[in-house]
């Protein structure tokens, strides 16, 4: 079989035969942008508040199809349009169809195939593909990228073959992306070779808002291996910090294996430990993934308070301990270089593992004995305050600031999109930045579908009530912050155009959720209907455990947006319980703010090992029920490695706090500021 490598701007055929090469860079000057926007479940154009996807689409330049062409797809559960806006809307046939589609995701196949057909029609060599998605729309964008990678992009005129291409890819996905020669992998390979274009189609950029790990509310259509794709060059992913619904668990690119504890609000995550040199149990050998013998590690279940940032651990832990200048990135690159030269170096599982900003991927071209491992360095996942729709949009503006918290994520994605070449209408970004300020969005209401209380309004720490009920100022800077907030609503109202005022007349005021829907969501939280989570092998599987309104699990290595820190500092009511350990410690040390934790403790840290003996309690059971000792070396390394992670993240965040404090916390960060200063035409 044939495989291709990207060398000096050209795709070269490996093996015998002719040269099927193409140089996309030669078309770069004349190539166009192709932008695909996928909205979230039940989200569409209409009287309801716009999501960030619709807001972004409205800002895109779409006048010259030779420069940029744009595509918008309504979300799952929005197959029909209702002109009725009052209570009668709930009794229409289209409403019932949309409700069933949102519950069972019947239209998922059509959504993916429609976007695929759009690319077939308009993509030419040299074009740059951009994808934006929210919620299950983000999931669709990731599945579409995986489909293009596996079966390719069909040549024009083969529209009738799209359904078959989808069925082949779907079967291959549900077989857990096998690499070895078997029916599904060979069929997909031959299909691509026969019908698809003879060059690799890349996705230049993906901007995603809170991608979730289930498609249907009752019928789960999640593929097991959609986390990562080798053909996506740049990924920006906004993740919700405060969403609690079990059917809206995050689907991150970076692996974060954990499982819920039965009838408990805490999680049991997994730590990475060294394997024993000569395993004797067949069950243990299966755990070591023998198809990839170069990576001699496995994930052992353990109650650990800090998730290990990199599952790729060296055989000699002293290497990491001896010199702080040696970074994990260098280790991964060395390992990847070694993997490329070994015929057995293939990961046949869909549980590809990585760390923040570096995810290891595999492109399957040709036979099972040939593989190409790549390291994609441009992945950024940022965690933002608020629930699912506070990140992706959809809530009405709150009454205090006339702003949405979701504008923070939109500002960040807009900034990244500008960086990578997306074209916007002249003046549209400046107009958006003027109407929707960082400070107004920062202190807008947060929401929680599982809370029967009203949305949490911002309560500034600078002003509080004393025992007599009088207002007491604690700091001048917080008083200035409140004065600034008082002017936001008046300014925002003065900047609204007539179209916005008309739309507001049909919008639910202040973003309140329906109490009946809150009750429905709580019923789903109490039922063990199945929640998709990443297990200790990095694979997705169903856990039939009631979610009970658990907060999301947040590993230690994640990247938090600046708005999380500012919101905690200035809003006395915002106290998330799933913060990384270094964040909780820093707020305690510098601000005197106590953040509770929903994470379990590390049993290894509590063991007495002063006499040098092996650590008691470090046991696990294999599949045959045999008790195996993990040993002192593994737990010592995991503890030391996490300690270094804590120190590094703590010092980096402390430096940020010192910079903000040097300006008395009055210089509000703005992700768009630098781009607006550089280009006045935006």
UniProtKB/Swiss-Prot annotation:
It comes from the Eukaryota. It comes from Saccharomyces cerevisiae (strain ATCC 204508 / S288c) (Baker's yeast). Pfam families: T6SS_Tle1-like_cat. This is Uncharacterized protein YEL023C. InterPro entries: Tle1-like_cat.
């Amino acid at each position: 079989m044939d495989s291709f490598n990207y060398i000096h701007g050209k795709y070269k055929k490996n093996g015998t035969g002719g040269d099927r090469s193409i140089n996309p860079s030669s078309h770069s000057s004349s190539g166009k942008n192709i932008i695909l926007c996928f909205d979230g479940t039940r989200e569409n154009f209409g009287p309801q508040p716009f999501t960030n996807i619709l807001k972004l689409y409205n800002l895109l330049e779409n006048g010259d199809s030779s420069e940029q062409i744009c595509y918008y797809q309504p979300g799952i559960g929005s197959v029909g349009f209702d002109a009725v806006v009052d209570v009668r809307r709930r009794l229409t046939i289209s409403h019932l169809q949309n409700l069933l589609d949102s519950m069972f995701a019947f239209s998922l196949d059509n959504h993916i195939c429609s976007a695929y057909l759009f690319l077939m029609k308009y993509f030419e060599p040299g074009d740059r593909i951009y994808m934006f998605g929210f919620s299950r729309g983000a999931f669709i964008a990731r599945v579409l990228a995986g489909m293009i990678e596996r079966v390719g992009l069909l040549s024009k005129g083969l529209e009738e073959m799209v359904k078959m291409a989808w069925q082949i890819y779907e079967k291959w996905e549900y077989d857990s992306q096998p690499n070895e020669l078997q029916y599904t992998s060979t069929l997909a390979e031959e299909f691509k070779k026969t019908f698809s274009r003879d060059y690799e189609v890349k996705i230049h950029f993906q901007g995603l808002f809170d991608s979730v790990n289930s498609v249907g509310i009752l019928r789960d259509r999640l593929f097991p291996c959609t986390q990562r794709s080798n053909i996506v060059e740049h990924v920006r992913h906004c993740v919700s910090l405060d969403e609690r619904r079990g059917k809206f668990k995050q689907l991150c690119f970076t692996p974060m294996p954990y499982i819920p504890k039965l009838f408990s609000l805490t999680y049991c995550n997994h730590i990475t430990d060294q394997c024993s040199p000569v395993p004797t149990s067949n069950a243990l050998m299966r755990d070591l993934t023998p198809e990839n013998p170069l990576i001699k590690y496995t994930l052992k279940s353990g109650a650990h308070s800090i998730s290990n940032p990199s599952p790729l651990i060296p055989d000699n832990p002293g290497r990491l301990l001896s010199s702080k200048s040696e970074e994990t990135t260098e280790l991964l690159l060395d390992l990847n270089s070694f993997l490329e030269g070994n015929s057995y170096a293939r990961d046949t599982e869909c549980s590809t593992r990585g760390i923040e900003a570096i995810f290891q991927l595999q492109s399957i071209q040709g036979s099972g004995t040939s593989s190409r491992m790549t390291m994609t360095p441009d992945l950024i996942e940022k965690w933002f305050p608020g629930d699912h729709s506070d990140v992706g949009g959809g809530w009405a503006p709150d009454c205090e600031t006339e702003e949405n918290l979701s504008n923070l994520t939109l500002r960040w994605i807009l900034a990244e999109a500008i960086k990578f070449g997306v074209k916007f209408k002249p003046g549209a970004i400046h107009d958006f930045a003027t109407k929707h300020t960082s400070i107004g969005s920062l202190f807008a209401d947060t929401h929680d579908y599982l809370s029967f209380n009203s949305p949490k309004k911002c309560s500034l720490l600078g002003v509080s009530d004393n025992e007599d009920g009088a207002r007491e100022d604690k700091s001048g800077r917080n008083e200035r912050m409140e004065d600034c907030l008082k002017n936001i609503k008046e300014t925002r109202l003065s900047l609204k155009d007539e179209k916005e005022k008309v739309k507001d007349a049909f919008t639910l005021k202040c973003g309140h959720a329906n109490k009946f829907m809150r009750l429905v969501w709580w019923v789903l939280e109490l039922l063990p209907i199945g929640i998709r989570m990443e297990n200790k092998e990095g694979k997705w599987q169903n856990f039939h455990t009631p979610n009970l309104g658990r907060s999301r699990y947040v590993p230690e290595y994640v990247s938090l947006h600046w708005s999380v820190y500012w919101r905690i500092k200035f809003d006395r009511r915002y106290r998330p319980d799933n913060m990384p350990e270094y964040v909780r410690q820093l707020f305690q040390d510098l601000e005197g703010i106590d953040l509770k934790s929903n994470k379990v403790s590390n049993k290894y840290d509590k063991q007495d090992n002063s006499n040098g003996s092996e650590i008691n309690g470090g046991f696990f059971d294999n599949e045959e029920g045999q008790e195996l000792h993990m040993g002192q070396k593994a737990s010592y390394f995991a503890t030391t490695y996490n300690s270094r992670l804590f120190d590094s993240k703590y010092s980096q965040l402390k430096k940020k706090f010192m910079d903000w404090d040097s300006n008395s916390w009055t210089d509000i960060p703005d992700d768009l500021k630098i781009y607006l200063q550089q280009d006045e035409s935006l």
